[in-house]
Amino acid sequence: MNHNGGDATVVDPMAQKVVATIPVGGVLEFPTSDGAGKVFVNVDDKSEIAAIDVKTLQTVAHWPMKDCKSPTGLACVPGPKPLVSSCGENGVAKVLSAETGAEVASLPIAIGADAVLYDAKRDVVLIPCRAGELEVISIADAAHISVVQRVPTQEGSRTATLDPDTGRIYAMAAKFGPPANPGGRPQALPGTFEVLVIAP
């Protein structure tokens, strides 16, 4: 995904060449796949999810997300379950049908979400937020999707990865000072980087 280019580049790794460029439009954030021929990507500036058909190499849908500002992280739950998108600017998690784009749920979460992780063994979605919380969302029952736990982490920790076997989450963290320029982002202080390990 080309973040500011508004398109997706398809690369043949064996031939080491670009085989297609797929127009999507907008500022592209995190993509995910359903494993069955569709790729989905958050379009930050349009507050929508775009769907790409891998076989035809075309964008086939644009699904707007009402009341979602700056969608970044995105996870696709395999099977009949949904897409989960984190709206980082206004503290919302949007849950959409991966087939139709219809909204299934809209959940309040902490501000500054980025990554969205799916833990298949525990059937939960995990969203680390810059405000210092890890949101745990149960999707075991499609009719009752909800935030079931808010785990305190560290302010600024919003990107993480998951060990699918143990369920442990590894989140990047640091101490922050004031922005370098007024209105800018807080600056990480040298020598304060660490990895938070969160057990299920």
Describe the predicted segments one by one.
Residues 1-200:
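Predominantly soluble domains enriched in secretory-pathway, periplasmic, or organellar proteins
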